Amino acid sequence: TLSVRGLASSKELQESTGKSQATVSRLLAQLSGRVLVLGQGRARRYGLAKSIRGLPAQQPLYWVDESGRFDKVGTLSLLSGDVLHVDLAGHTFVTKAALPWVLDPLRAQGFLGRLLAQHLSASGVESDLERWTLESILFAALHVQDAPGAIALGEPADPTPAGKVHVLPDLADDADNMAAALDQLSLNVAKTLPAGSSAGGEQPKLLARYADGTHVLVKFTPPRGTAFGERWHDLLHAECLALDTLRAHGIATATTKMVSSPTRTYLVSERFDRLGASGRRHLVSVGAAHTGFVADAYQNWTNTCAQLATQQQLSKDDASKAEAVWHFGRLIGNTDMHSGNLGLFVDSRTLVRPRFRIAPIYDMLPMRWRPDMVSGAADYSAFEPNTLSLQSAARHMAQVFWRALAESDTVSNGMREVAQIMVERT
């Protein structure tokens, strides 16, 4: 029964087996090495432990606070039947074949996730993230020291047998040395790029730190002088400008700066889920919050944030900001505003009915022009702005963005020309 259900109470085991309470208790005692006792009193359940690719089925959960202190806040248990039992900060989450919303940041994804999959391939982990089982997701999380958010899985002082992913490299303060360091780091990453990444529109990234310990995420272009390199050069400059525009209009964004070398262009963003050298804040995507607390099917940022505000889990002001940024994105050609591209802060004291706060905006750029394997770096072409977005408060911000881009001396003539057309259409 437990091998199929994963988790059951004594009464449920009695009903499914037809055995008495005494018999069930005796059988459970005989399996004490494999059966986990989870919960207290009436909430007590029994689960059949399933190892995490040879590692213990039960792993500690730590919450890293803003000062960098690790506090043990719970235990994660992987059970037979792909059931996950999580006791976290006094709350219990039970899911099947998936992480609960609050642990979603532990799930490797995107470009950095694919690099991690390659790093772990010798351990038998699938190279395709889309094929990862819950066991693979947890195994990978146990090998990462710097996952997004404030929750860490596994003992921080005891690296797992395959070894934790390498420590973050430090970047020099001055621009020339920083560019040289980034050139070397990006070259190292490029040598291990997942197949098709550079040509498939997937943005290459790496993690690093400034000399003072500030954590940064770095996007970088393919080599300059190539069609894809020149296109991503334009797009990264447009992203920096879009974030500057939002910030100038009172909307918090990731703090970014451009760094250039003769071979590549870099967008360096300070991580807002980190504080100083070791402090952290917990951050989940709007998609994870939707899964946890919104009954309707996911549509977009605006709808989810409006629903969270109605449920008093997000302020009306934050919901309005999310709507404004959504319309701004549509007006500047951001076709990639998926459920993982808007972050919400949450703290450990409100996990049953959390009160979210919108995080700084990131990944805001005209992705409609990103290169891909089918069309390559197609010529820039103007588009008709969404009518509803043109009627929103974001229109003025979009006009400011297009004017600034049309006058920029850091992007190509093609991008300046299409930006000028968009000034007239917005």
Please place each PLM-identified region on the residue numbering.
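Phosphate/dinucleotide-binding and metal-coordinating scaffold of catalytic cores
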Residues: 3-339, 343-426
